[in-house]
């Protein structure tokens, strides 16, 4: 019976990945299609991916698959061929290749079955997720950006929007995708006559969001094919102006892909221009926040003097202080001025 899960420590796997000499390619993909038996599909894909030395994060549900992975460069074409052959629904699937990639995005393969591949909070039995808005490609995106009758809606979380977004795009302030969906409907009620263009990192969230908007009576809805990643790639290939400003936040060790030279965010500690996310080095905190190099040195990678002091304590004392605290890491939410519990590197399905 093959082993269908990882049995090596994270530290050992990360150390092994960091000394790998073979280049890797970071890839993301998704597909909404019916999977009759997600558990069996998960186990079969786990064996396929493991044989090709694929790392990353993969979610499966009855509604489809969502993956962010790292593949050895020498195995990319074999991976593509085997993925396409795995199920007719996956044949010809678009694979989003990372724009700014050092090959160190993942170091372990985690593959899970979930209720949804994106946690949307939708429980309306009449909702048709396949009734999506029209796709837009790079040139069409730029044309829409110049159309005064079009509104661009960013369907990413607040910390993603903070470091980069399309020109004049509207932020739907929320910590999770499930919070954004009803807010988007509410905020757009006065603009039902407008052309609504939705976008996200790789396309999975804005595709479902476009269907949700149509379900709620919005008729002129588009979404960007392949999200920010595919837009930027195609715009560059076609010699078009790239109209996304700043950095594209990604849900792996890189925490961002540089799209333009502009830095539109600021250090959460001193206010200097900066768009580099990090997690607080205090194991009892792990706050996700933006920190400039000066503050990183001053606070030793921590988010505050308190965390800096605590991280310098003996390990046993640190463990004692953490006992009984709320589990999970936090995200700095500048707009609300409070901390929010979530995963260390946020979960892209939330």
Curated annotation (Swiss-Prot):
Membrane-crossing residue ranges in chain numbering: none
A Pfam family per the record: UPF0176_N
Residue intervals of the Rhodanese domain: 146-240
Reaction equation(s) it catalyzes: uridine(34) in tRNA + AH2 + O2 = 5-hydroxyuridine(34) in tRNA + A + H2O
Keyword terms: Oxidoreductase, tRNA processing
Gene Ontology molecular function: oxidoreductase activity, acting on paired donors, with incorporation or reduction of molecular oxygen
Highest taxon above the source species: Bacteria
One GO BP: tRNA modification
Free-text function comment from the UniProt entry: Catalyzes oxygen-dependent 5-hydroxyuridine (ho5U) modification at position 34 in tRNAs.
Protein name stated in the entry: tRNA uridine(34) hydroxylase
């Amino acid at each position: 019976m093959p082993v269908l899960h990882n049995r090596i420590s994270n530290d050992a796997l990360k150390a092994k990945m960091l000394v790998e000499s073979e280049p890797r390619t970071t890839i993301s993909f998704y597909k909404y299609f019916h999977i009759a038996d997600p558990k069996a599909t998960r186990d079969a894909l786990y064996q396929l991916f493991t044989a090709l030395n694929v790392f990353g994060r993969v979610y499966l549900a009855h509604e489809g698959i969502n993956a962010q992975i790292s593949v050895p460069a020498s195995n990319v074409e074999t991976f593509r061929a085997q993925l396409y052959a795995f199920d007719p629904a996956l044949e010809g699937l678009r694979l989003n290749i990372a724009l700014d990639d050092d090959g160190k995005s993942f170091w372990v393969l985690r593959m899970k079955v979930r209720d949804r591949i994106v946690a949307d909070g939708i429980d309306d039995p009449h909702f048709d997720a396949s009734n999506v808005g029209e796709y837009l490609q790079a040139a069409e995106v730029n044309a829409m950006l110049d159309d005064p009758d079009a509104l661009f809606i960013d369907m990413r979380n607040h910390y993603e929007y903070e470091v980069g977004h399309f020109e004049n795009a509207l932020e739907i302030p929320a910590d999770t995708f499930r919070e954004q969906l009803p807010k988007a409907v509410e905020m757009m009620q006065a603009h039902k006559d407008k052309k609504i263009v939705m976008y996200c990192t790789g396309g999975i969230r804005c595709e479902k969001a476009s269907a949700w908007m149509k379900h709620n009576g919005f008729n002129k809805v588009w979404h960007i094919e392949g999200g920010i990643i595919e837009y930027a790639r195609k715009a560059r290939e076609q010699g078009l102006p790239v109209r996304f400003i700043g950095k594209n936040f990604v849900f792996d060790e890189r925490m961002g892909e540089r799209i333009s030279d502009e830095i539109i965010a600021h250090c959460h500690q001193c206010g200097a221009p900066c768009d580099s996310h990090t997690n607080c080095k205090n194991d009892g905190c792990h706050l996700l926040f933006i920190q400039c190099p000066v503050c990183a040195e001053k606070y030793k990678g921590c988010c505050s003097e308190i965390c800096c002091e605590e991280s310098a304590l003996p390990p046993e004392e640190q463990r004692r202080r953490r006992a009984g605290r709320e589990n999970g890491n936090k995200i700095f939410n500048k707009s609300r001025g409070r901390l929010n519990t979530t995963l260390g590197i946020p979960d892209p399905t939330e």
